[in-house]
Amino acid sequence: MSDRSAVLPQYLFPKQALTNFAGWVAGKERGAVTTWIIRRFVAKYGVDMGEALESDINHYKSFNQFFTRALKPGVRPLAQADLVCPVDGAISQFGAIEGDQIFQAKGHNYSTTALVGGDAVLAARFAHGSFATLYLSPKDYHRIHMPCDGRLVRMIHVPGDLFSVNPVTARGVPGLFARNERVVCVFESAHGPFVLVLVGATIVGSMATVWHGVVNPPRGGELREWHYADQQILLKQGEEMGRFLLGSTVVMLFPPPPLAFNPDWAPTRPVRLGEAMANLANL
């Protein structure tokens, strides 16, 4: 079966209703039922609870509390690199932005303008720059951290579809990451602007940032944005900036010149928060 055929049912599936329901269930505190669900999830996906700040699953009152669990201090040391990996997950793709085109999968590109919600001026700052797309699987730690020091400038909530995100949909759904619902976070750093995009997916109940809290829901048809240039919201390298309440993917954009990525990086390779991602080629 081709990838396009494999994803065809998702065009027909009531993804929004399923996602809303999953988010509602994940937030409920159901005592022994919640504990049973968490225990089954840990066993099914091989979650390493030994790394969690609270390793006893009976501690978690809801599935969302478990899913967004904190890690023990020191289990993810920061590498000596200009940019460190912001998540636990796996590499989807990374490399140079060709003009304004980001590589998604063989035969599929999408534009930086589409990714950031249609702002061509913002997107132009990353022309011929670099990108990295990282996928978080169900077993992974689901908080997102800063790849480098940054000052928050702007946040954009872009409404969109809710296709599941995995290698099959990346190959079978054109413009997947610029098509799904997403939260675009724009930062300034000592080396220029950079963007972290939190991409939603089927059953991703919501996405949250440390400065705003839950961004979605509400889910509507209108793009929403917030400006922070007059506020001193400063986040250090490795500091938490957001989290997924179930699911998905982070896309990062950096301006030119192209980054010198970790030579060990390759598509599908597992990555850990804090490992070396890239160095700035002009330093």
UniProtKB/Swiss-Prot annotation:
Pfam families: PS_Dcarbxylase
UniProt similarity note: Belongs to the phosphatidylserine decarboxylase family. PSD-B subfamily. Prokaryotic type I sub-subfamily.
Active site: D88, H145, S248
Signal peptide: none
Protein name: Phosphatidylserine decarboxylase proenzyme
Organism: Variovorax paradoxus (strain S110)
Residues marked Cleavage (non-hydrolytic) (site): G247, S248
Organism phylogeny: Bacteria, Pseudomonadati, Pseudomonadota, Betaproteobacteria, Burkholderiales
Its membrane topology: Peripheral membrane protein
Cofactor(s) needed by this chain: pyruvate
Gene: psd
Subcellular location: Cell membrane
